[in-house]
A protein has these predicted regions:
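All-alpha effector-binding/dimerization core of bacterial HTH-type transcriptional repressors
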Residues: 28-203
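N-terminal helix-turn-helix
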Residues: 1-26
Length: 203
């Protein structure tokens, strides 16, 4: 078998991709997590035996816009901590997450958050709060040029956009997060049950 034929077979199998003028590259394994429980990305990656890291891109206090204020149940222009991070799976960029923290936890998070530190661990260990319920949405969106560059060479122009509004046991908002995940490297697995079947089983 020739090298050219071997590369063609690997490309057809979806194991490599080619870039004109640069050569052939190994495709990263797609990571899939179950969307059935409230977990952090760190926990999801641990379940997959993949090291999870983060790089802080921005950490600042800003006035809450109308959308963020509504999600956090606070008045517009209330100071909130905005944490923007590049999330890593192993050494490879996976997502850009922008988190807006409720004023009751934001200042404490600022003191303890750092690269490769779990936000949920800081919330529990330093703030004494734990997200127990969340509303999450998924859609496909177009990355800005700087976001595409940040997510690595050959990152697709489209990404999976997520939003999450997390609450504590008292149903008070803790955070509102907007994530942009590489669609070629990350996916969600969702299990569903028919309500009609459940109703028949009860009768």
């Amino acid at each position: 078998i020739t090298v050219r034929r071997a590369l063609s077979e690997l490309e057809e199998a979806g194991q490599i991709y080619r870039v004109q003028g640069k050569g052939a590259f190994v495709k990263s394994q797609k990571l899939s997590t179950k969307l059935s429980a409230l977990t952090s990305l760190t926990e999801d990656m641990r379940e997959l035996n993949v090291p999870c890291g983060s790089r802080i891109l921005a950490l600042e206090t800003i006035p809450a816009g109308s959308k963020v204020a509504k999600k956090l149940h606070i008045d517009e222009n209330t100071p909130v901590v905005m944490l923007k991070r590049l999330r890593l799976a192993g050494d490879s960029p996976l997502a850009i997450e922008t988190c807006y923290l409720h004023p009751r936890v934001g200042p404490t998070v600022c003191q303890y958050i750092a690269d490769d530190v779990s936000l949920y661990a800081v919330l529990w260990e330093k703030c004494g709060v734990c997200p127990v319920y969340a509303e999450q949405s998924l859609e496909i969106g177009l990355l800005q040029p700087w976001e595409q560059r940040m997510l690595g060479e050959n990152a697709p122009v489209y990404a999976m956009f997520t939003t999450r509004q997390a609450f504590d046991a008292e149903h008070s908002p803790i955070e509102y997060v907007e994530g942009k995940y590489r669609a070629d490297r990350y996916s969600y697995h969702i299990s569903m049950t028919s309500q009609h079947i459940s109703a028949r089983q009860k009768n």
